[in-house]
Amino acid sequence: MPPEFELIKEGNGLSFYERWINMEDGTKSREVKFIISIKAPYENVIEVLTKEKYGMLWNDNTLAYKIKSTGPQSWISYMRYSFPFPLSDRECYLKNRLEEGKESTKIYFNSSNSRIFSEGVEMVQMTGLEGRWIVTKKQGYTLLRYHIISVPEKG
């Protein structure tokens, strides 16, 4: 069973947690979790997370943000990030799947091998990512939970 999350920082409606998990191959992976209280309607939060036009507004250091639908509640998202020297710019493709519930919506994501927005371009890929967003309706606000872990590549 993985260890409990440790609270790292808290303030202004945001709590940041982390934990280290021993993977099957012996490597350690860091999992982070954010819990954010947002004074905005639930539907608006879902729209910001799922619509291309908002991606660069909430995703820091993003040079490009694109979405391609793959089904009624699934899509591929593409982010190209700017990193300072000595790192190079990187890109990330994620498969996303949305599950709607009565009081909350979950968006699961994990790294994708797709290159639909950067075919033929040599770029460092951010891989081995998986996580989820959980958006919950509350009285007068929306609660947003974000989990992400970097999972070592197999092979």
Where in the sequence are the language-model features?
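Eukaryotic helix-grip
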Residues: 1-155
